[in-house]
Curated annotation (Swiss-Prot):
Keywords: Metal-binding, Repeat, Stress response, Zinc, Zinc-finger. A zinc finger (C2H2-type) spans 224-247, 261-284. SUPFAM superfamilies: AN1-like Zinc finger. Zn(2+) 2 binds at residues 28, 31, 45, 47. One of its GO terms (molecular function) is zinc ion binding. It holds the Pfam family zf-AN1. The keyword Transcription regulation does not apply. May be involved in environmental stress response. InterPro entries: AN1-like_Znf (IPR035896), Znf_AN1 (IPR000058), Znf_C2H2_type (IPR013087). Induction: By cold, dehydration and salt stress. Coiled coil: none annotated. It comes from Oryza sativa subsp. japonica (Rice). A zinc finger (AN1-type) spans 7-55, 95-145. This is Zinc finger AN1 and C2H2 domain-containing stress-associated protein 16.
Amino acid sequence: MGTPEFPNLGKHCSVGDCNQIDFLPFTCDRCDHVFCLQHRSYTSHQCPNANQKDVTVLICPLCAKGVRLNPNEDPNITWDTHVNSDCDPSNYQKVTKKKKCPVPGCRETLTFSNTIRCKDCTKEHCLKHRFGPDHKCPGPRKPESTFPFGNMLRRSQKAESCSNSNSSSTSSSWWSSSLLTAATSFKSSAEAGMQKLSTATTQAIQKAKDGISTSSSNSGDLVEQCVQCPARFSTVGALIEHCEKSHQSNSQSSRSRVTVDVCPKCSKAFRDPVLLVEHVERDHGGTSRA
């Protein structure tokens, strides 16, 4: 068996009448014997263990599921076990019913290659009705409103009307009425605040106008006022005469009053303190002590 280069090449067939050497032998997965190409099947070499791993699957007519029959078990027992535990008749429609195009009058079966999903209505159609006008597409869904508070009020009002008609829904009626009451009170308080602000502004403007008119009526024609006293005069000449009589003497007396600094050593008088300091430093050696 084999050659000098490959002494273990090839094996003899296990069938007694054959015993043929095969360089590519087959090993049976049931009896683990080696056979040639002619006797590789179970029936050709009459394998005694052929039925041990036999696989038989039956399709259930109720649920369209596969039921595997066990080799060492009665098929009736296996079938009863499936019917009492795993059988689901609702699965039959899912498996056997083929998906078709939803357009009325179209009987096209939808498969992997001819199915198109519409972006607007998100439904699957065949290639013939893939465009919106062909399958009467309703268009994209409208976006929700950007005012959730208003929608909440409308929903609460609808809920309240429904609760009035149906006395059993007392809980939803209470929540909707509470929300509506809160919104109404918030609106009324805002309106009251705006009304108060408008009233206060009007009163302030009226008071300012009244003050201006009162001051002008009290002063009459006295438009010239003295800068040194609160006296008022009708003409500039009267104001000048008042200043000369009442405030001229005070200005002259203030001018006649002159501060004099006296040297403590020589009793020399100086009007400017700087001159006194220079005199002391120059004539008395920088000291003012006697």
